[in-house]
UniProtKB/Swiss-Prot annotation:
GO terms for cellular component: mitochondrial inner membrane; respiratory chain complex III. PROSITE patterns: CYTB_CTER, CYTB_NTER. GO terms for molecular function: metal ion binding; ubiquinol-cytochrome-c reductase activity. It comes from Dobsonia minor (Lesser bare-backed fruit bat). Heme 1 (or BL or b562) is low-potential and absorbs at about 562 nm, and heme 2 (or BH or b566) is high-potential and absorbs at about 566 nm. Its main location: mitochondrion. This is Cytochrome b. The keyword Transport applies. The cytochrome bc1 complex contains 11 subunits: 3 respiratory subunits (MT-CYB, CYC1 and UQCRFS1), 2 core proteins (UQCRC1 and UQCRC2) and 6 low-molecular weight proteins (UQCRH/QCR6, UQCRB/QCR7, UQCRQ/QCR8, UQCR10/QCR9, UQCR11/QCR10 and a cleavage product of UQCRFS1). This cytochrome bc1 complex then forms a dimer. The chain crosses the membrane at residues 33-53, 77-98, 113-133, 178-198, 226-246, 288-308, 320-340, 347-367. Binds 2 heme b groups non-covalently.
Amino acid sequence: MTNIRKSHPLFKIINDSLVDLPAPSNISSWWNFGSLLGICLGIQILTGLFLAMHYTSDTATAFQSVTHICRDVNYGWTLRYLHANGASMFFICLFLHVGRGLYYGSYIYTETWNVGILLLFAVMATAFMGYVLPWGQMSFWGATVITNLLSAIPYIGTNLVEWIWGGFSVDKATLTRFFAFHFLLPFIISALVVVHLLFLHETGSNNPTGIPSDMDMIPFHPYYTIKDMLGALTMILALLVLVLFSPDLLGDPDNYIPANPLNTPPHIKPEWYFLFAYAILRSIPNKLGGVLALVLSILILALMPLLHTSKQRSMMFRPLSQCLFWLLVADLLTLTWIGGQPVEHPFIIIGQLASILYFSLILILMPLVSIVENHLLKW
């Protein structure tokens, strides 16, 4: 008799994706982040669902409903902080996952990579709208500033912004639609995740060497299931430490002040995971130019397969490219720091230099250094 896991139509799909899936024998812990992102998504959907049961998307009661969740709902504070800090864990895993893809040349699988970029945009949109929901000062002003950027689009800009707002300012209509989209998007993300995995399983996983591993595969279970469980345990432990010891570490104190359209906070800034893009936006004095740079700072990832000039796939054996990669990481950390600083000297010039370096590294320096490495290896 055939094993039900291999004969049942539904179990067969799960078996081929999680149990009998052939995986390279040498993939390191950098390959753990896919499963960690799946766990993050699960945590966010579950905690979000329970929060939505108590939240009201009305400007008069939104702030109060979040206070009610924290004070009166059983373990409501846990749900709220798990959800808020879960988003931070989500982005930490996302950035590491994308960084792994850049370092080891995973972008050569263009379909998987492009769906991944779509996922990144979808998660960023979801996080932005979620930040607006508590209706604190930073929620309101963050929503006003970021949506207002669309007015830089020629001809249709102003109409587009008012259409998104549902009026002439960020108000009740905006909050209600943001809540609706914030609830809907994670399910769209889940569908995109399935497509992402579908494309990945067409080609199989890449590995640290970048050399095809068809001749040396091992079953996913038990080897990588146990490895993923260790990663999951580590991440959940880190999340719980954050939630139970310093839940407001990554938040903004201004968001504990109810939204007030008549009082602008001294420094409007988004959550930490958007600061690098925010710094790039602010470093260009022109509004439309800033918006284009903001979008391109993420969309530039789509050019990675075209900018790959090396004869080797991975950076594992390319020390010059490795140096530039870590320079890029340092540059992104610098941009993140600058995004959280006020717009004054010397932060303005540091931000502008870091932005120039960011685009130069990806578009010019890394492809050139790859060509140099090819010649050094006489390829």
